[in-house]
Structures are given as structure tokens and as C-alpha cells.
Curated annotation (Swiss-Prot):
Record's protein name: Outer-membrane lipoprotein LolB
InterPro entries: LolA/LolB/LppX, OM_lipoprot_LolB
Protein transport keyword on record: yes
Claim: Protein transport is one of the keywords in the record: yes
Self-association state and partner proteins as the record states: Monomer.
PROSITE patterns in UniProt: PROKAR_LIPOPROTEIN (PS51257)
GO biological process: lipoprotein localization to outer membrane; protein transport
Residues with lipidation of kind N-palmitoyl cysteine: C19
Amino acid sequence: MTLRSFLILLLSSIVLAGCSSVPESVTSVEWQAHEQRLETIDNFQATGKLGYIGPDQRQSLNFFWKHSSALSQLRLTTLLGQTALKLTITPQGATVETYDDQVLSARDANQLIYRLTGLMMPVDHLPDWLLGLPTDADSFQLSPTNTLQALDKQIGLNDWNIAYQRYGDIEWHEQTLPLPNKLRLSTSDVKINLVITKWNITQ
């Protein structure tokens, strides 16, 4: 597998983990209050490390995710700081730039991922999932501290699970807000570990 093919597979795996429908469930008042606070976040930046484990590939990368209503951007870099892949999504369209200077564009991110992987999938909910919101999930579970503990979803023939393994507190609007800082995305043959080392809520 070439590096470019691996990065496309990695990107599609991350995107796969961002799209899924939430059933009606009984939740606590504390969770509902936490969920409402998360839903007010429109602009954020997340920095961290990503580990990918597949059937024939293992890779460690740094990531930087920047999201606002006008721009969403994911940049993956090697441990030496070289940009491996950058995905940019705006209201006008989506673009992927690869380490070998190839640029691929489409009217929206769904079309771009389809062109790269042959899979049609929505990507609109990925920022919410990173924050710990169960937007459009098949099912979800809460932790004893009323944060999101796990999500389950089926996309095509694959059953995906997102486990929120650790949270960290940040100060936001003079209150303490727990945000995910360790997640595992997994299906039958792929595991993606995310460690978020820094959150920046910018509004």
C-alpha cells in the first residue's frame, strides 16, 4: 500500500466515524445541560496525536482540526512536522491536498470522499462527535459523570464504535467544561486512537 493510498484510507476511516441517528433515550438533567453547552460551541481548534492500526498498516501522525461555521480544516502531519494530508471544507466546496502535492476538489466533502474511496457518506457531524455530542448516532451511552461514553453506528456493512476513554476540563465562560481528550474509533479490522492534547474554544 502506498503512502497516498494509506492516507486516503485513513481519511475515509476518520470521516466514516463522523456520520450516524440518535434514538430516543432517557437521559439525566445533568447530561442535557452539558449537551446544551456543547451545542453552543461553533468555533474550536483541537490539536493532538493520531494512531492508525489496520490489517497491513500502522501509522502515527499529528493532527490539527480547526472548525467554524465558515471553515473546517483537518491537517495531518508526520512526527517530523511534514504535512501528510490536509482536508479543507467551506460552504463553497471541499479540497484535499496530499503530501505529494496532489490537489483534489469537489463541490462538497461527500463528493470528494466518494471520489477518493468510492464510498458515499455524510461528514456534517464530525465536529460534533469530536466535542462529545451524539449527533445522528445509532445509539449512545453516557458515563456516570454525564458525559458521552460511547457511540455505535452501522455504515454500509461496517459496525463502528467510538469509545470516549478520557475527558479533561477546560475553563470556558467562567465554568468548567469537560471535553474528550482520548478516543478510540474501531471497527472489525481498523482502530484509530486519538489523543487531544489541546483544546481552544475561540468564540
